[in-house]
Amino acid sequence: MAKEYSRTQRIGDQMQRELAQLIRREVKDPRVGLVTITAVEVSRDVGHAKIFITVMGQENAEQIAQSIKVLNSAAGFLRMQLAKEMKLRSVPQLHFHYDESVARGAHLSALIERAVAEDSQHGDAPAPEDAKE
């Protein structure tokens, strides 16, 4: 059986693809780096859309905030361009947010790698599963 997607999910997926191209092509502000749209959440009434982004190469919170500010100020222009590309009765208002999950995931991966490295250094003691054999 095919997986069911709601209308808002389909709109969000299409918006994600279209916005990625529009930002790359149309937004010429140097304060906006290499933006990746990680997710788009569209409200049930299709009136608002939260666009979650990451910015490659910008780890500084001020730079990220500046990129978000620029994208939010360009939201009207991007919305107008989306209206030309998408066949919708009304295009949602765009709200850009920084996606912290990618940075959090990288931090957790680093913690896990460090813990594994420490365990391998102290590897003299057998693991509890190995002791039973």
UniProtKB/Swiss-Prot annotation:
Q: From what organism does this protein derive?
A: Pseudomonas fluorescens (strain ATCC BAA-477 / NRRL B-23932 / Pf-5)
Q: GO biological process: any one? A: maturation of SSU-rRNA
Q: Where in the cell is it found?
A: Cytoplasm
Molecular function terms from GO: ribosomal small subunit binding
Keywords, sorted A to Z: Cytoplasm, Ribosome biogenesis
Q: What coarse category fits the chief subcellular location reported for this protein?
A: cytoplasm
Question: Which PROSITE patterns does this UniProt record tie to the protein?
Answer: RBFA
Provide the function of this protein. Answer: One of several proteins that assist in the late maturation steps of the functional core of the 30S ribosomal subunit. Associates with free 30S ribosomal subunits (but not with 30S subunits that are part of 70S ribosomes or polysomes). Required for efficient processing of 16S rRNA. May interact with the 5'-terminal helix region of 16S rRNA.
Recorded hits in NCBIfam families, A to Z, give: rbfA
Record's family?
Belongs to the RbfA family.
Subunit? Monomer. Binds 30S ribosomal subunits, but not 50S ribosomal subunits or 70S ribosomes.
Domain of life according to the entry: Bacteria
Q: Which PANTHER family match?
A: RIBOSOME-BINDING FACTOR A, CHLOROPLASTIC-RELATED
Source lineage = Bacteria, Pseudomonadati, Pseudomonadota, Gammaproteobacteria, Pseudomonadales
Would you tell me the protein name for this molecule? Ribosome-binding factor A
- Return the InterPro entries for the record: KH_dom-like_a/b (IPR015946), RbfA (IPR000238), RbfA_dom_sf (IPR023799), Ribosome-bd_factorA_CS (IPR020053)
- A single cellular component GO annotation: cytosol
